Amino acid sequence: MPAIAPLASPPQSQEQLLAQARQLAGYSLGELAALAGIPIPRDLKRDKGWTGILLELWLGASAGSKPEQDFAALGVELKTIPIDSRGRPLETTFVCVAPLTGNSGVTWESSHVRHKLQRVLWIPVEGERTIPLAARRVGAPLLWSPDEDEERQLRMDWEELMDLIVLGEVERITARHGEVLQLRPKAANSKALTEAIGARGETILTLPRGFYLKKNFTAALLARHFLLQHD
């Protein structure tokens, strides 16, 4: 393979970003970590975001965990997605933290979820636990925007979930709500509480929530673009 190097500054165009991402396809995480001079953990138990951080480094990302997209100047969000040997997602995909208060007047068009999913660079990475972390390979990237049908599905779920939040029913929401988008606790520990609206309109303390794309949504998306068998 030709010698490659991390981008020293944020990419200037979507084409440059995609070209760099394509260069990473086929490399293992261990090879990319060594070339970038960063240590690789034994596993992801305590370093869950490590794969994303490594690829952000290679692609010149700028946003970190801020509300804007990873490549804010390009309007592109980076999402690494662990896949099995058949190219299917192994887990749900975090989109953004859900606002539990101050939601009067918020619409789908102005929502963080829509903003984050307007343009996404998906990078599949081997994720099966039988493969050592350093040996897991990076797959071919996909630069994606939701089509009309996908946007409709996302909007319907978002509106249903936000209605429940505004009506003070956040604690009734389960991961089963929503066809393609779900809401579930985001905190690493149960002591990190945040304010929300209770059933009688009072302020309550609850776990922070995050929006996640369900596996059926990302599986269909990958299958369609990479011509995989989707069942």
Curated annotation (Swiss-Prot):
A Pfam family recorded for this sequence: MutH
GO molecular function annotation: DNA binding; endonuclease activity
Any one Gene Ontology cellular component term annotated for this protein: cytoplasm
Gene3D superfamilies reported for this sequence: DNA mismatch repair MutH/Restriction endonuclease, type II (3.40.600.10)
GO BP field: DNA modification; mismatch repair
Taxonomic superkingdom: Bacteria
InterPro entries in the cross-refs: DNA_mismatch_repair_MutH, DNA_rep_MutH/RE_typeII_Sau3AI, DNA_rep_MutH/T2_RE_sf, Restrct_endonuc-II-like
Span of the signal peptide: none
Annotated localization: Cytoplasm
Keywords recorded for this protein, A-Z: Cytoplasm, DNA damage, DNA repair, Endonuclease, Hydrolase, Nuclease
Matches recorded under HAMAP family: MutH
Role of this protein: Sequence-specific endonuclease that cleaves unmethylated GATC sequences. It is involved in DNA mismatch repair.
Family: Belongs to the MutH family.
Designated name of the protein: DNA mismatch repair protein MutH
Encoding gene per record: mutH
